[in-house]
Amino acid sequence: MTAEHYSLVGDIGGTNARFALVKQGSIEPEAIEVLPCRDYENLDQAVVTYLERVGVASVRQACLAVASPLRGTRVTMTNNHWRFDIEAVRQVFGWSAFKVINDFTAMALGVPHVSDANLVHVCGGPGDPGRPKLVMGPGTGLGVSGLVPIRNGWVPLVTEGGHVDFAPTDDTEMDVLRLLRARFGRVSVERILCGQGLLNLYQAHAEIRGVAAPLDAPEKITAAAVDASDALAGEVLQHFCEMLGRTAGNSALTLGSLGGVYLCGGMLPGFLDFFLGSPFREAFVAKGRMRPLMEFTPVYVVTEPYTGLLGAAEALGNSEV
């Protein structure tokens, strides 16, 4: 590969770092590699290893999406040991430009580039493509972002919408709030609508009912719900989907996202059929007088595994980022 024709893009989470190359003027990632973060002392080592694997000595510029709040030039990863200074890394590699963006900002920027084959329609539509899009994703946490259309593209909205207060709507949810408040103090929607949150919800339901909670990991709960081997797991996952629908609907109303709601992240594709049959749809549209507006808003599950890389590639040439 000829180095001067490529830029480096990456999507770095708590566990893995995904890297790819993109040609100048393109957003299609090539030579994708996934490196375990624990195997590398720092970002520099991981980048060097990646470039060696793909046979490129250097690239002109780079954009990395990171699972971390961004303030200034110092980056401290939320769920792994990497720490780096943006300008110092740029100088080490001799890049002409180095952008670092939030991982969910990248997810949002990638959504317009996801093919129809990797979008599963959940409900609603046809929507209005000229209006904002909401991007939400339960995974390690609950990411929330938005896209506002401009003349030649999109402006991403960097938010911490997963940290808004959890608002219970019935007696069971009041009990869930009481139990989680005793554990965490303040209870955000992310305390429920993410992988660890599903486990929190399962344990709370078990305590409310006075029954055992033998499942100790979110993937065990989803597996038991899908194969109907644990009744409590099934009910809890239904409740999880319902609350996700309600929360997505609230965010859609706030943003005015008639351009669509896009559900990303690693969780939902793992139990997609269950999700499509869950109370999500009704919870999303059940907004009283606003129901017709919600029914007009299309909702999709994004199954593209490298949406963040697409977004990082988009960010390279997006002057709004």
Curated annotation (Swiss-Prot):
HAMAP family: Glucokinase (MF_00524). SUPFAM superfamilies: Actin-like ATPase domain. One of its GO terms (molecular function) is D-glucose binding. This is Glucokinase. Its EC number is 2.7.1.2. NCBIfam families: glk. Pfam families: Glucokinase. ATP binds at residues 10-15. Keywords: ATP-binding, Cytoplasm, Glycolysis, Kinase, Nucleotide-binding, Transferase. It comes from Marinobacter nauticus (strain ATCC 700491 / DSM 11845 / VT8). It is found in: Cytoplasm. GO terms for biological process: glycolytic process. InterPro entries: ATPase_NBD (IPR043129), Bacterial_glucokinase (IPR050201), Glucokinase (IPR003836). It catalyses: D-glucose + ATP = D-glucose 6-phosphate + ADP + H(+). Belongs to the bacterial glucokinase family. GO terms for cellular component: cytosol.
